[in-house]
UniProtKB/Swiss-Prot annotation:
Pfam families: NUDIX. Keywords: Hydrolase. The keyword Mitochondrion does not apply. SUPFAM superfamilies: Nudix (SSF55811). Belongs to the Nudix hydrolase family. RppH subfamily. The gene is rppH. Its EC number is 3.6.1.-. Signal peptide: none annotated. InterPro entries: Nudix_hydrolase, NUDIX_hydrolase-like_dom_sf, NUDIX_hydrolase_CS, NUDIX_hydrolase_dom, RppH. It comes from Baumannia cicadellinicola subsp. Homalodisca coagulata. One of its GO terms (biological process) is mRNA catabolic process. One of its GO terms (molecular function) is mRNA 5'-diphosphatase activity. It comes from the Bacteria. This is RNA pyrophosphohydrolase.
C-alpha cells in the first residue's frame, strides 16, 4: 500500500528492557542493523500492524509487551535513488512511519527472530538507548534521531 506521493505507510518498533537497553536486530544475511519495522496492510490500523510485525519479526505477542508511547507525528524518509525498485508499480520512494516504544514485560528468551515465514533478522542484541543512532543506515538516521529524541523525553532519558 503506497500512497499517492510514493511513500509506504509503515510502523517502527523500539523494544526496551528493564535495564534501559533496546533491542537491535541485524537484517537477514546483511551487515545492516535496525529496529523492527514493517508495512501497514490495507484496512489495518498502525497499532494492529505493529502487533502483527512484532510477532512476525521477533515472535512476541501483545501480552509480552506494554506500549509506553508512540511518535506524535508520522516520520518520513526517502530511499536513495540506487535502492528504489524502478520496475515495481507503484514506485515506492520512501517510508512514512509511526513509531512505537514498547516495554518488554516477559523474559527475553521469548524473543524468536525465526518466527515469520521469511525471517527479517538473523541476530539480535541489547544495546544502549542511543547506540542505534550512530549505527543505522545513513538514509534512516534523521528519522531515528527525531523518534529517539521524542522517546527519550517520554521516558525521561538525557539527550
Amino acid at each position: 500500500m503506497i500512497n499517492e506521493y510514493g511513500y509506504r505507510p509503515n510502523v517502527g518498533i523500539v523494544i526496551g528492557n528493564f535495564n534501559g537497553q533496546v533491542l537491535w536486530a541485524r537484517r537477514y544475511k546483511q551487515n545492516a542493523w535496525q529496529f523492527p519495522q514493517g508495512g501497514i496492510n490495507s484496512g489495518e490500523t498502525a497499532e494492529q500492524a505493529m502487533f502483527r510485525e512484532l510477532f512476525e519479526e521477533v515472535g512476541l505477542r501483545p501480552k509480552d509487551v506494554r506500549i509506553l508511547t508512540t511518535t506524535r507525528y508520522w516520520l518520513k524518509y526517502k530511499i536513495p535513488h540506487q535502492f528504489i525498485r524502478w520496475d515495481a508499480k507503484p514506485i515506492c520512494i520512501g517510508q512514512k512511519q509511526k513509531w512505537f516504544l514498547l516495554q518488554l514485560v516477559c523474559k527475553d528468551t521469548r524473543i524468536n527472530i525465526q518466527c515469520g515465514k521469511k525471517p527479517e533478522f538473523d541476530s539480535w542484541k541489547w544495546v544502549s538507548f542511543w547506540y542505534p543512532l550512530s549505527q543505522v543506515v545513513f538514509f534512516k538516521r534523521n528519522v531515528y534521531r527525531r523518534m529517539m529524541k521524542e522517546f527519550s523525553r517520554a521516558i525521561m532519558l538525557p539527550e
